Amino acid sequence: MVKVTFNSALAQKEAKKDEPKSGEEALIIPPDAVAVDCKDPDDVVPVGQRRAWCWCMCFGLAFMLAGVILGGAYLYKYFALQPDDVYYCGIKYIKDDVILNEPSADAPAALYQTIEENIKIFEEEEVEFISVPVPEFADSDPANIVHDFNKKLTAYLDLNLDKCYVIPLNTSIVMPPRNLLELLINIKAGTYLPQSYLIHEHMVITDRIENIDHLGFFIYRLCHDKETYKLQRRETIKGIQKREASNCFAIRHFENKFAVETLICS
């Protein structure tokens, strides 16, 4: 019978060989640690896709910011813009059935009729806003009028019909804002006696304007949500003019040293 024995010294030496050295650290890895940092490939978002989403978010925020700025500017202009001066005054003019060579302060008061209106002047924007209240004459309509010297346009809003009419600005009749402001100051101070004559201008309605955005801020504000039409001017004469058509309405106003009757016919 043979007895097999092991050298204990040799076994201890081999065991020591497998042990880490005193200056080294032993790394113990748990069995389930292999899959800790692994992810499902379907859950991984490509870098390019993340970058595209980032750009979309940036552009969306930029558009929202631009909309807020533009909307705020529009609301400020719509609600906070105030005219430089507001006047409520009138002008006297000779009746159509009376002929005088020149208006005179000595003429009897019965020979004159009076137009009163509310005038707002935006001198910096070169815009005049005229509000004609319900007149004492049955043959004239109340209206709001905008003269925009930047756009070179005039717009009439007939308050009886609730319709807008646009025509190129007639600078031979309409005073520039600064000159009109001086005239109103003189009338208010009493240095100018507003007794004058009546000018007739005859307009014909032509095409309907579907989009009024290009007509400028002030005309847009006047005519927004209103039926808006173009006008064509026939002729402007001083004195009496016979009304050719029954389908007409008149707006009497002034923005000069004389009164104007704007006759608009379909």
Swiss-Prot record:
Site (Cleavage): 243-244
Post-translational modification: The ectodomain C-terminal part of the imBRI2 is processed by furin producing a secreted Bri23 peptide and a mature BRI2, membrane form (mBRI2). The remaining part of the ectodomain of mBRI2 containing the BRICHOS domain is cleaved by ADAM10 and is secreted (BRI2C, soluble form). The membrane-bound N-terminal fragment (BRI2C, membrane form) is further proteolytically processed by SPPL2A and SPPL2B through regulated intramembrane proteolysis producing a secreted C-peptide and a BRI2 intracellular domain (BRI2 ICD) released in the cytosol.
This protein's GO CC annotations: endosome membrane; extracellular exosome; extracellular region; extracellular space; Golgi apparatus; Golgi membrane; Golgi-associated vesicle membrane; intracellular membrane-bounded organelle
Effect in UniProt of substituting residue 170 to A: Accumulates in intracellular compartments. Does not inhibit furin, ADAM10 and SPPL2A extracellular proteolytic processing activity
Molecular function as annotated in GO: amyloid-beta binding; ATP binding
Gene Ontology biological-process entries: negative regulation of amyloid precursor protein biosynthetic process; nervous system development
Residues annotated as domain BRICHOS: 137-231
Disulfide pairings: 164-223, 248-265
Lumenal side: 76-266
Parts of the chain that traverse the membrane: 55-75
UniProt similarity note: Belongs to the ITM2 family.
Pathology noted in the entry: Cerebral amyloid angiopathy, ITM2B-related 1: A disorder characterized by amyloid deposition in the walls of cerebral blood vessels and neurodegeneration in the central nervous system. Cerebral amyloid angiopathy, non-neuritic and perivascular plaques and neurofibrillary tangles are the predominant pathological lesions. Clinical features include progressive mental deterioration, spasticity and muscular rigidity.
Biological role stated in the UniProt entry: Plays a regulatory role in the processing of the amyloid-beta A4 precursor protein (APP) and acts as an inhibitor of the amyloid-beta peptide aggregation and fibrils deposition. Plays a role in the induction of neurite outgrowth. Functions as a protease inhibitor by blocking access of secretases to APP cleavage sites.
Protein name as annotated: Integral membrane protein 2B
Organism phylogeny: Eukaryota, Metazoa, Chordata, Craniata, Vertebrata
